[in-house]
UniProtKB/Swiss-Prot annotation:
Full protein name: Small ribosomal subunit protein uS12
Gene3D superfamilies named among the record's database cross-references: Nucleic acid-binding proteins (2.40.50.140)
Function: With S4 and S5 plays an important role in translational accuracy. Interacts with and stabilizes bases of the 16S rRNA that are involved in tRNA selection in the A site and with the mRNA backbone. Located at the interface of the 30S and 50S subunits, it traverses the body of the 30S subunit contacting proteins on the other side and probably holding the rRNA structure together. The combined cluster of proteins S8, S12 and S17 appears to hold together the shoulder and platform of the 30S subunit.
Keywords, sorted A to Z: Methylation, Ribonucleoprotein, Ribosomal protein, RNA-binding, rRNA-binding, tRNA-binding
Lineage, broadest ranks: Bacteria, Bacillati, Bacillota, Bacilli, Bacillales
GO biological process, one term: translation
Cross-referenced Pfam families: Ribosom_S12_S23
Gene: rpsL
Amino acid sequence: MPTINQLVRKGRTDKVWKSKSPALNKGFNSLKKKSTDISAPQKRGVCTRVGTMTPKKPNSALRKYARVRLTNGIEVTAYIPGIGHNLQEHSVVLIRGGRVKDLPGVRYHIVRGALDTAGVDKRMQGRSKYGTKKPKAAKK
């Protein structure tokens, strides 16, 4: 609890709000070669590296990730959800916000089924999250 004198000297400071996905809050004007403050729900980018990394302490796996250079010039690390993927260097992908709790520094997800990213094969439930089309009904 501050004293009255401390409050007179310093005062109360407002909490600074910080974005959880800052790369989506920057645009780029290619004609003027300047960054803009226009935010977007998703952004397009090109994969510069595709690989696997291991998660933090209690978990154990090989999580798939991609380094993506976005259209605004920022390079970010994005998680590739689902089982199996067709991404390689120079693939064009769409990223959305959303961190992966056990991978430090990964704040974005790649959208499956958009641009060069294929949907997850043989997925029956939760298909919309993995870009999988509805399977054809079996003939009787």
